[in-house]
Structures are given as C-alpha cells and as structure tokens.
Amino acid sequence: NLGRIESTNPCGEQPLLPFESCNLGSINLSKMVADKDGQPYIDYDKLSQTVKLAVRFLDDVIEVNQFPLPEITEMTKNTRKIGLGVMGFADMLIQLGNPYDTEQGLVLAEEIAHFISEEADKASMELAQERGVFPAFQESIYDTPDGPRFRNASRTTIAPTGSLSIIANCSSGIEPLFALSYVRHILEGEEFIEVNPYFEDIAKNRGFYSQDLMKQLAEGKRLKDVEEVPEEIKRLFVSAHDISPEWHVKMQAAFQKFTDSAVSKTVNFPHGATPEDVAKVYMLAYEEGLKGITIYRDSSRCLLYTSPSPRDQREHRVCRLLLEKRGGGGGGGGGGGGGGGGGGGG
C-alpha cells in the first residue's frame, strides 16, 4: 500500500497518490476508420498497432522526463502509471453513419474501450518482459501467483483533450460535437468561425451547403430547425445541447466500464436546468459506476472558449453582478456549454 489517493489532475480523470505525476496520451479515433467498397469500418489492426506504440511511448516519457522534485521522480517511477485515452470519437461515429445518442453508439463505445484496454494490457505486459515490472509491483493488487505482470500500474485514462483535439483537428475526447459551426474565442479578444469538416463535406455533396447556412449555425440556429437539411443528416450530426443529460452519462459509463482510471466528460444542461435535474444526473452517475462527473449549465459563465450562440444576449445574473461590482453596467452573457471541458475524477 503506497498510501491514499489524495488528488486528481486538473480535469479529474487521473487519480493521484502523493507526488505522482500525470502522464496521458490520446489516440485519434477519427483516423481509425477505413473504407472497403464504400462501406466504412473500424480498422482494428491499425488501432492495435497504435495502442502498442502509444503505450511504449508513454512509458518512455516517464524514463526521459525531468521532474521538478525528487519525490515526484521516485513516485512516478515506482508505479509508472500511464493514461492512454481517445479523442475523435464523435468524428468516428459520424464516419460510420451512427448517431451519438443511440444504443449502437453505446455498443461501439464499449467495444472500442474494451479493445483498447486489452491491447494496452498486452503492450504493458510485453514491456514488463523487456524492461521489468513497475518497482511497486510487490505492493500491488497484481502480486499474486497467477496475476498479470505489468510494466505500468494503470494503463488507460480518458482525458477531455480540449486543446489537443484542436491541434489534431478532431472532436474532443468522447464528447459529442459541441456545434457544427461556431465562434471560437482566442487570445486578446479575437474570434473566428469554425465549421465541422464532416458536416461541410456532406452539405456540399448533398447540395444544401451555403455560406448563409454556416453563418446561421454559427449565430446559434439549431440544425433541427433548418428545413433544407435532410432528417437523417440532422440525426447524425446531433450536438451536445440536443442530447439529454442521461445519454451523456450513459456514454461516459460505457467507456468507464473498461478504463483503469477515470473518464473526463461534460454533461451539458440547458439554461433552465434545476438543482433537482442536476441531482438526478449525479445519482445516475453513481448508479452507473462512474468515478466522477462534470456538469455544465448553459450560459452559467460570462465567456466560453467556444460558443454556438455569440449573439445570444440572454440576461446573465452572475455576469451582471460582476460587471456592476467592477463599475461596468448590466450585461448579457452569450454562450453555450462545456464541449471538451473537464470531467470525472477518482
């Protein structure tokens, strides 16, 4: 027993013992879809090789990293915990033609999480044969006559990848799409409009693309309210705010079932959500076996990094009070929900 878990990393998906560090990496699932005779499928051979390489890479990171304190170096190398996760899950579902909030979506989530977990375990056991088990192995739950011999005390964690997914140009973590066309707020008050590339391609191929449509969506119009878009496309490109909180929890639970540490996931609530609504989701998360959960109520912050409705001038009491305190005047608060924000803890 190395002690009690005392904290998590900032987004809560990695439980940490005193002086442990957080060593995470994420596989872009949108790159794991192949096509045969016009039929998309998950390329599990490619995914298997990617998992094996990623586990080795993360173990190498522990070895070459220069930690700020000797205590961190000691604890990190004692357990050698890594956290391999995913991003681009929503993009994968879109390529497969499967809406996010469906039973088939949950089946795919469990299937992928299970596969990655098994492949990560195999890769860590191979590393143990090559480099040895983690030093604290004899004090661990794996120290049994027939127990697995791992190089890393834990192998999988699902992070939100809010910034990483921007670099990789894919959907964040296991989140659904936040919006199809939206304004992204960056440094020094600048902003720019982004359009989901899969939606843009389908819109052009199906003949309903227009700059005006992209502008309307960026200004907050919901896809379900656009008449010229076919119903099956509306269903496929469901966004975070169109998915019920219960479905958000179900999807997180599907991944948590096969994840060593925790899963970071935002449950988006409408602005009018009540404390009872939130309590219901907390209880559902507990019943589903989640290790933590994050909720976000629409427009409960003054400014978000991504907003599907930049012109929404809804009265925002918290922002108004802050502005009055600073000598500013009343104020509106545009915005939408988390979309890649933090998630469940340990």
Residue spans of the language-model regions?
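Core alpha/beta catalytic barrel or barrel-like domain that forms the active/cofactor pocket
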Residues: L16-V33, A54-E71, I82-L96, Y100, ...
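Conserved small/polar residues in nucleotide/adenosyl-binding loops
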Residues: Y305-D312, K325, G329-G346
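Catalytic alpha/beta core of large soluble enzyme barrels
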Residues: E13, L58-E63, D146-P148, T156-S307
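Function-dense linear segments that define catalytic or interfacial modules
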Residues: N1-T76, G88-M92, C170-S171, E175-P197, ...
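N-terminal leader/propeptide and maturation segments of large enzyme subunits in energy/redox metabolism
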Residues: K31-S48, F57, T76-S117, E191, ...
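Internal maturation/activation junctions in enzymes
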Residues: T50-T73, K77, N98-T161, K234, ...
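A glycine-rich phosphate-binding loop feature that marks nucleotide/adenosyl-phosphate handling sites
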Residues: N1, E71-I82, L106-E111, F134-R149, ...
